[in-house]
């Protein structure tokens, strides 16, 4: 089959201490400190064969994530920008949906023809973090499109336990093609759902929510905030096209952060009280978190979703005197996240279809 494959050179930076685990597995914990000179091409790849508990999916739709871009974009020394867990070469693509075309001999929950979307975090279920209920922090984690072959391909094999049926989404949109496209947005939406409602504990209806960034994660956060009853949703995004999308999915106010002082804007909108819930989805916390800090309501929350391997200036006294909290979030697995997002989309309470703005073939 054909797949969109990224390869890169293992060339750790002089100040990066490669662990024995990294040497043994070929996986880099901090990708932007190890992988250099990335090369991206469509090429032949072996057809996947299902294991006993696996299904083979014919990929129907796969979204382009900011992470995919950061695998190919580089710094001045030609190191990839993505700072997380990676192993190359591999097929990219992890926001996807597909139709079951083959099942392993022990598969019990799926059959040929089923429509599904899939978790990207391949957790083991045996390690201490998994057994304690933290699958997103699995000690043996693999990630589709990061460390194992992804879905920018004709087919992909996955364990049935990571698949979720999307019939409700297809029924909502009235046809399979649109259902598959919208279902491919489930994974990034689950990343925002996990961060906002599992990690940070959500917010009360009527609370004011700010979102920094309007990529797929930020747009999903806006849609979820609207569905959860936010009183005001304000978004900050440098792209004019994405600002328009932010309005379409639920933002009440949108701004170019280069043209305003975000913290001052939020204080004005809230009449001096500050915003209750802040979402960092821009991957630029050194710029965004200080603005959130200026506009933290009493008992306010900041949740970090965007990936950025950098230190952030913050006055911790602000968290103390405002009884506020800062949450880090990773992944999307467990905690009813996938089924709840599918229910929201199927019920029509969350519609991110406007953010599908272009379609490309594998070639």
What are these regions (language model features)?
Residues 67-73:
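Cytochrome P450 core scaffold surrounding the K-helix E-X-X-R motif
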Residues 46-63, 77-128, 169-170:
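Glycine-rich beta-strand-centered segment in the early N-terminal region that forms part
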Residues 6, 200-205, 228, 240, ...:
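Glycine-rich cofactor phosphate-binding loops and adjacent beta1-alpha1 units
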Residues 116, 208-211, 278-280:
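Conserved hydrophobic beta-strands of the Rossmann-like cofactor-binding core
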Residues 83-89, 94, 124-212:
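NAD(P)H dinucleotide-binding glycine-rich loop of Rossmann-like/cofactor-binding domains
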Residues 161, 175-260, 264:
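Mid-domain Rossmann-like dinucleotide-binding core that forms the NAD(H)/NADP(H) cofactor-binding site
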Residues 11-61, 87-89, 106:
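A short N-terminal beta-strand-loop micro-motif at the entrance of redox/enzyme domains
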Residues 17-18, 268, 290-294, 298, ...:
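C-terminal hydrophobic helical "lid"/dimerization subdomain
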